[in-house]
Amino acid sequence: MWIKSQHIKAASIIIGWLSSLAFGASAQNPVQADSAQAPYDSAIAEALSGTLVCYSAPRTTEHQWLFSIGGENLLDTYLSPLAYKGTTMGTSFRTERFTHFGAQRWTVRARYSLHAAYLASPTDNGKEWDMQLSGSGALLYNFSLYTGWRFAAGGALEGRTGFTYNTRNGNNPAQGRAAVAFAATGLAEYTLRVGNKPIRIRTEADFPLVGLMFSPNYGQSYYEIFSLGHYDKNVRVTFPGNAPELRWTTTLSLPFRKARLSIGYEAEIRQHRINGLKYHAWNHRFLIGYTRHIYVVK
């Protein structure tokens, strides 16, 4: 079904990470955190009410922290021909605000996440540790077709790095990963009110279109790449044909004191077939966290 595992001596790999994103989604000069009953819940909430252009609303930034737990199914034929399964846990942070241009039609969004998983082979005699760090910056155009709805679509530049460590492999214990991609992104939000309490349902998706990915070639060791300098198509172009990927997140946000309690579900599908190697990481996660808005001086 899958190609045989290559027992190759692997050197450790340290991969640099994006130090910052082009989109500065963090606001300056915060003056007040909102409550669920605030008259201007945020500029984004004004869009939810059906009025996208709201010049009287203070400029706001939305911050959301989410914590996750779920299951992961991982296959990396550089390490093993078997798919490993186990528990994944992680955290993510999202910040979003309207731009200074475009009459509050455009928003910028930054998102960062860190996930780790402990996995076992089908016979439970092999274990793997998996870690991924990712970040993205997006620019989205907002529009509303119906009262209470907000839609947005745009593009995102995203990058990620990580590794998988297999406890059974003596000569070939680890695989490092690094990739950047341009992705299409979109979201839909709906806000309803129960009494004077706003409740928001949000669903969003990211679909990478084209990018670059590091990968050793079939039968190639990290010693050959980094010590001997033997390059063998180790940076490859990715697109949906060889690396179909999708992240889909849905959350429900409920008023809770001066913030919002957010619960939801996330599916993240990462897979590729490059350099004669197959990889997939299928994740399903339960989410819980909180969302806040910070009012700022224009």
Regions found by a protein language model. Give the residues of each.
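Outer-membrane beta-barrel transmembrane domain signature
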Residues: N171-F256
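Residues that define the transmembrane beta-barrel architecture of outer-membrane proteins
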Residues: H63, A83-T91, K127-G135, W149, ...
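Transmembrane beta-strands of outer-membrane beta-barrel pores
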Residues: I69-T77, L114-A120, L157-Y165, Y190-L192, ...
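Outer-membrane beta-barrel "beta-signal"
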Residues: W282-K298
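Outer-envelope beta-barrel architecture signal
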Residues: R59-W65, G102-A110, T147-G155, A178, ...
